[in-house]
């Protein structure tokens, strides 16, 4: 059984978001990644033998390993009076994922990573959140001073 998911980078970013969200809910990294990647691709015993794409694993393990650093970067770009705790889990996860790819994936142009995470945000969050994520990540990409440092 398959659906419209392919192994395109956009689809793998979406799968990475799903895995990271599940990890936040207590799932183990590899199990969350395998589930996010394969839940609608195969059924039964075949589900245990799916080989996960390197890009997907790199995103999930990278965000997981750099979570504290990413959260600190996000916090420095929040407007005065806002805190990381005030953000929804969906928005935090999207920000972490987008920021990680922008910061650590040299082969992906910053604007491409930014636009791709906005597309995922539009699917899993609302328009206001997508604009917020766009603004914060655009500020990071442009090297603008942090909003709460003024």
Swiss-Prot record:
Protein name: Transcription antitermination protein NusB
Coiled-coil intervals, chain numbering: none
SUPFAM superfamilies cross-referenced by the UniProt entry: NusB-like (SSF48013)
Gene: nusB
Family statement: Belongs to the NusB family.
General function of this protein: Involved in transcription antitermination. Required for transcription of ribosomal RNA (rRNA) genes. Binds specifically to the boxA antiterminator sequence of the ribosomal RNA (rrn) operons.
A Pfam family the protein falls into: NusB
Entry keywords, A to Z: RNA-binding, Transcription, Transcription antitermination, Transcription regulation
Any GO molecular function: RNA binding
Species this protein is from: Streptococcus pyogenes serotype M1
InterPro entries listed in its UniProt record: NusB-like_sf (IPR035926), NusB_fam (IPR011605), NusB_RsmB_TIM44 (IPR006027)
